[in-house]
C-alpha cells in the first residue's frame, strides 16, 4: 500500500474525497500545516491532533541539514522522531534550493549550493533527494524539481521545465529501486480505507456534531468529530506499506509549457500530481489563471496538490476549482506577527484599540482560544513579547484554516460551494 484516493462527491470541478496513506485517512480537500523542522511552530503534536490535523509537512532541505537524515531514520523516520502517528508529506528541497539563488549552480546532474547555516558546500540531485526522503519516511514524498523565478524569460522557463521532467523520471527510477528502505517498513494496517468520512471512531456511526465554523451561520461537522481516525482499526488485514511519490508540474507563467509539463509528468506516471513554482512574486490573478489551466491537464482520479499557496480565501477558491491538497506557512507566520484570521476579517492584534476589548477574538469561532481568551488579553501577550502569544495566535489561525476547509468540504458535499465561497471572499480586513 502507498496511497488510495477515493472521490466521494463532486460539484462542478470541486470534489470531496479521502486520501488513505499507511498512517491514516485524510479528508480532501485538505489544508496541510507546515512543520519545516518536524515542528509546527508553537503547537505540540497532541494539540495538532486535537485540532484535527491528519497530515502535515516536513522540509527535506532543512531536515537534511539538522538533525540529519541518519538521525531521523534511526528514530523510525519522522513519525517516530517527532512522535506523530498520522500522515506526513515532505517536499524534495527543490524550492528551498531555488530560494538560495545567490548560492546555487544548476546542472543536468543536480544543484550545487551552500548551506544557509554555515556556508558548507552541498549537492542535491534527484537521486539524493529521493534517498533523503526515503530516509525521512514521510507517507508522501515529492520528485526533485527546479522552480523558476518570476519574472523569467520564456526560454529560461522552457529549459527549466524540461530539466524538471528529466529529473522526475530519475526521481521515479531511484524511488522504485529503493522504496523498500523506508524506515517504518514492515506492515501497516490498511483497514482505515473502510472508515466512513463522517466517523472518527471507525464504528460506521455518524459521530459528527454541528457548530458554526469558517463563517457565521455555517453549520458543519466539527473537525475533531468529522475527521476519520488517523490510526488503524484492530483486526485489520496487514498490507505492505510503501511511500507514495508525487510528480510536480512546472512551467512558470507559460500556460503551454504548463500543459507540456503536465503531459510529460503524467507519461512518467505518479499516484498524485503537484502544481509547483507559484507564489514566487506573481500577481494573484496570474496564479489562479495558471492553476485553472494546469488542472485541466491533470488526471481527475488522482489527488492534485497546489504547493505553497493559500490565504483562507484562496484555499477555498482553489478547492472550488478542483484542488485536493494545499499547504502554506501563512497561518503560522502571520500568527507570529500578530495577524489573525477571523470570520469578520483579518485582525492585527497588536493595535492599541484592543487594549480594553473584552470580547472573544472571533465570536463565530469555536477554537479553544476564542472560547477562553479576550482580545485584550491576546493583545497584552503580544505587546509583552510573551511566547504564549505566538502559541495562542497560531492555534487560532490553524483552527480557522482547518474550519474553513471543513466548511468547504461540507458545502461541496451539499452542492453549496458557490454560496459558501461568496461569503468567504467578501470578508473585510479589520
Language model regions located:
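Conserved, mostly hydrophobic/aromatic
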Residues: 24, 56, 91, 133, ...
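C-terminal extensions of enzymes
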Residues: 1-18, 26-30, 42, 145-151, ...
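Structural signal for hydrophobic packing residues in well-ordered secondary-structure cores
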Residues: 137, 168, 172-175, 179, ...
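Intrinsic disorder/low-complexity segments
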Residues: 178-242
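Glycine- and acidic
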Residues: 149-154, 158, 272-278, 387-390
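Non-catalytic, usually N-terminal nucleic-acid engagement modules in DNA/RNA processing proteins
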Residues: 1-184, 352-355
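Glycine-rich phosphate/ribose-binding loops and adjacent secondary-structure elements
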Residues: 178-181, 244-246, 250-361
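Active-site pocket-lining/capping segments in soluble small-molecule metabolic enzymes
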Residues: 84, 89, 94-101, 107-111, ...
Amino acid at each position: 500500500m502507498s496511497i488510495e484516493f477515493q472521490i466521494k462527491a463532486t460539484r462542478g470541478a470541486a470534489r470531496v474525497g479521502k486520501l488513505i496513506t499507511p498512517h491514516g485517512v485524510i479528508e480532501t480537500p485538505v489544508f496541510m500545516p507546515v512543520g519545516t523542522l518536524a515542528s509546527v511552530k508553537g503547537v505540540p503534536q497532541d494539540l495538532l491532533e486535537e485540532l484535527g490535523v491528519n497530515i502535515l509537512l516536513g522540509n527535506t532541505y532543512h531536515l537534511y541539514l539538522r538533525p540529519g537524515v541518519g538521525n531521523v531514520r534511526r528514530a523510525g523516520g519522522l513519525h517516530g522522531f517527532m512522535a506523530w502517528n498520522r500522515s506526513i508529506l515532505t517536499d524534495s528541497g527543490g524550492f528551498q534550493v531555488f530560494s538560495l539563488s545567490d548560492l546555487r549552480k544548476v546542472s543536468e546532474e543536480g544543484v550545487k549550493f551552500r548551506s544557509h547555516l554555515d556556508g558548507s558546500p552541498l549537492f542535491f540531485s534527484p537521486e539524493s533527494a529521493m534517498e533523503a526522503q526515503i530516509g525521512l519516511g514521510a507517507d508522501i514524498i515529492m520528485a526533485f524539481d527546479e522552480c523558476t523565478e518570476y519574472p523569467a524569460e520564456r526560454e529560461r522557463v522552457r529549459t527549466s521545465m524540461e530539466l524538471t521532467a528529466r529529473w522526475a523520471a530519475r526521481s521515479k527510477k531511484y524511488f522504485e529501486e529503493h522504496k523498500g528502505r523506508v524506515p517504518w517498513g514492515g506492515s501497516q494496517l490498511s483497514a482505515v480505507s473502510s472508515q466512513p468520512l463522517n466517523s472518527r471512531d471507525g464504528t460506521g456511526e455518524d459521530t459528527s456534531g454541528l457548530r458554526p465554523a469558517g463563517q457565521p451561520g455555517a453549520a458543519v461537522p466539527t473537525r475533531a468529530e468529522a475527521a476519520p481516525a488517523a490510526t488503524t482499526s484492530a483486526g485489520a488485514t496487514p498490507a505492505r506499506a510503501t511511500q507514495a511519490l508525487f510528480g510536480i508540474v512546472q512551467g512558470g507563467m507559460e500556460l503551454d509549457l504548463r500543459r507540456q509539463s503536465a503531459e510529460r509528468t503524467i507519461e512518467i506516471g505518479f499516484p498524485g500530481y503537484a502544481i509547483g513554482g507559484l507564489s514566487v512574486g506573481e500577481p494573484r490573478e496570474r496564479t489562479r489563471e495558471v492553476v485553472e489551466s494546469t488542472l485541466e491537464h491533470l488526471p481527475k482520479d488522482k489527488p492534485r496538490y497546489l504547493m505553497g499557496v493559500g490565504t483562507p480565501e484562496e484555499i477555498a477558491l482553489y478547492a472550488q476549482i478542483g484542488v485536493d491538497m494545499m499547504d502554506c506557512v501563512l497561518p503560522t507566520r502571520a500568527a507570529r506577527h500578530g495577524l489573525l484570521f477571523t470570520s469578520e476579517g483579518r485582525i492585527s492584534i497588536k493595535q492599541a484599540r484592543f487594549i480594553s476589548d473584552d470580547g472573544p477574538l472571533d465570536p463565530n469561532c469555536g477554537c479553544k482560544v476564542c472560547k477562553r481568551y479576550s482580545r485584550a488579553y491576546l493583545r497584552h501577550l503580544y505587546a509583552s513579547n510573551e511566547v504564549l502569544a505566538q502559541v495562542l495566535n497560531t492555534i487560532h489561525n490553524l483552527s480557522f484554516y482547518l474550519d474553513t476547509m471543513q466548511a468547504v468540504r461540507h458545502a461541496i458535499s451539499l452542492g453549496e460551494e458557490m454560496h459558501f465561497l461568496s461569503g468567504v471572499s467578501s470578508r473585510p480586513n479589520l
